[in-house]
Amino acid sequence: MLETTIDFSRYSSVKIGTPLKVSVLENDDEISQEHQIIGLANNLLIAPSAKNLALLGKNYDYICDKGECVEIGGAANASKIFNYFRANDLEGLEFLGQLPGTLGALVKMNAGMKEFEIKNVLESACINNQWLEKEALGLGYRSSGFSGVVLRARFKKTHGFREGVLKACQSMRKSHPKLPNFGSCFKNPPNDHAGRLLEGVGLRGYCLKRVGFAKEHANFLVNLGGAEFEEALDLIELAKARVLQEYGIHLEEEVKILR
């Protein structure tokens, strides 16, 4: 098993972190239940003390036409998947033109934008070398019900790439901040929006040391420059406490915190 050092202050989308050892997994028999897969670290906040970090190597970066379905390796990135579906006139993953991440993370969190999400197109996934049908994965709103590493997944083939869906997703992205961030900080509570709640307690544009909630959209935690893990964690806890006190609602993080 190969090992490398990754500086997460450069590698992660929020640009917060320290240099840490990361295992590079190239074969199924190297996978362990203890591994914390980092992918491209787009929706992660990684502690300086985080252990068992790993990423899938180049052997998992592929897209293969299987006839009735498309099989995609866990390390294939969203841009590559989007371009394949568009070039082959396939529908269902148009939103990946506006989302970062690797296939493994996209399946694990049932990634999506509004009503467009991974589970709408997914057929099955190989978790720790065991194939599971979609129904067994427990996919919900930005969540899943399985533990383990997504090594590969299969998607149904339906012809007819939808440019209209892509344009709708592009329009949604216009409100996203330009500063380093990890996408939505919190999941939307049932019948409400995290951004509305955060704005309601005065956190839109609010800064705490070197982190803050974006002026463009309150549900985006941004790195104002040189921020550290504890600063981001403090702001997340502050936001949860304020929303709970004001609205009686427990906000749940969409960002994954690895310790």
From Swiss-Prot:
Keyword vocabulary terms for this entry: Cell cycle, Cell division, Cell shape, Cell wall biogenesis/degradation, Cytoplasm, FAD, Flavoprotein, NADP, Oxidoreductase, Peptidoglycan synthesis
First-listed, main subcellular location of the protein, grouped into a coarse class: cytoplasm
Subcellular location per the Swiss-Prot or TrEMBL entry: Cytoplasm
Any one GO CC term of the record: cytosol
Reactions catalysed according to its record: UDP-N-acetyl-alpha-D-muramate + NADP(+) = UDP-N-acetyl-3-O-(1-carboxyvinyl)-alpha-D-glucosamine + NADPH + H(+)
Gene3D superfamilies: 3.30.465.10, UDP-N-acetylenolpyruvoylglucosamine reductase, C-terminal domain
Active site (catalytic residues): 142, 184 (proton donor), 254
Entry's Gene Ontology molecular function annotations: flavin adenine dinucleotide binding; UDP-N-acetylmuramate dehydrogenase activity
Cofactor(s) the protein requires to work: FAD
Pathway participation: Cell wall biogenesis; peptidoglycan biosynthesis
UniProt record, GO biological process: cell division; cell wall organization; peptidoglycan biosynthetic process; regulation of cell shape
Source taxon at top rank: Bacteria
E.C. code: 1.3.1.98
Functional description taken from the UniProt entry: Cell wall formation.
Similarity field: Belongs to the MurB family.
Protein name as it appears in the record: UDP-N-acetylenolpyruvoylglucosamine reductase
Organism: Helicobacter pylori (strain ATCC 700392 / 26695) (Campylobacter pylori)
